[in-house]
Amino acid sequence: MTSEVIEDEKQFYSKAKTYWKQIPPTVDGMLGGYGHISNIDLNSSRKFLQRFLREGPNKTGTSCALDCGAGIGRITKRLLLPLFRVVDMVDVTEDFLAKAKTYLGEEGKRVRNYFCCGLQDFSPEPGSYDVIWIQWVIGHLTDQHLAEFLRRCKRGLRPNGIIVIKDNMAQEGVILDDVDSSVCRDLEVVRRIIRTAGLSLLAEERQENLPDEIYHVYSFALR
């Protein structure tokens, strides 16, 4: 439980905001110095997502996606814009969203909205998105705020829409990272929060071919 490791919720959020403000707006910055894993990550994400875009009558649409904790748009550029007609981005750091406008290049014209907001305060427009992609950012929310955010995301889905969470998983329990002011939860804790939010787990997959020294990374498709 995050309540056991976070002493001051307000400080937990403000410290993270301050941390990201001093990170360079680059792919390497977004990935904490692990920019070289970006291709491995994106290729696996594409395969994971495409199974839902391909399936028969209940397949997920490709009109609109939301990139949560989008940063400069690493995922928007390489995963979402190639597959969706329009994309919205949300991130707490204004400088990252400003950089996205040049980083995304010509295709960035299809980014409809740049929302500058922490996810704990963000509400996706109801019934708007085929896919809501939430990667490497759930650790910046408390358990309660994460469950509430996922409930709002559920309302934000179009028919047959899905939510994808992709994130680090701890071996056991909840671990606080005091540097960037985030937590890493184990699989069971994350699954419990997903259930609390009233979502069903459609698929779960471990990311392969990552460096040994980093956390295990899992993807979850939810509805």
UniProtKB/Swiss-Prot annotation:
Its main location: nucleus. It holds the Pfam family Methyltransf_PK. S-adenosyl-L-methionine binds at G69, R74, D91, V92, T93, L119, Q120, Q135. It catalyses: N-terminal L-alanyl-L-prolyl-L-lysyl-[protein] + 3 S-adenosyl-L-methionine = N-terminal N,N,N-trimethyl-L-alanyl-L-prolyl-L-lysyl-[protein] + 3 S-adenosyl-L-homocysteine + 3 H(+); N-terminal L-seryl-L-prolyl-L-lysyl-[protein] + 3 S-adenosyl-L-methionine = N-terminal N,N,N-trimethyl-L-seryl-L-prolyl-L-lysyl-[protein] + 3 S-adenosyl-L-homocysteine + 3 H(+); N-terminal L-prolyl-L-prolyl-L-lysyl-[protein] + 2 S-adenosyl-L-methionine = N-terminal N,N-dimethyl-L-prolyl-L-prolyl-L-lysyl-[protein] + 2 S-adenosyl-L-homocysteine + 2 H(+). Gene3D superfamilies: Vaccinia Virus protein VP39. It is found in: Nucleus. InterPro entries: MeTrfase_NTM1 (IPR008576), SAM-dependent_MTases_sf (IPR029063). Keywords: Acetylation, Methyltransferase, Nucleus, S-adenosyl-L-methionine, Transferase. Distributive alpha-N-methyltransferase that methylates the N-terminus of target proteins containing the N-terminal motif [Ala/Gly/Pro/Ser]-Pro-Lys when the initiator Met is cleaved. Specifically catalyzes mono-, di- or tri-methylation of the exposed alpha-amino group of the Ala, Gly or Ser residue in the [Ala/Gly/Ser]-Pro-Lys motif and mono- or di-methylation of Pro in the Pro-Pro-Lys motif. Some of the substrates may be primed by NTMT2-mediated monomethylation. Catalyzes the trimethylation of the N-terminal Gly in CENPA (after removal of Met-1). This is N-terminal Xaa-Pro-Lys N-methyltransferase 1. It comes from Mus musculus (Mouse). The gene is Ntmt1.
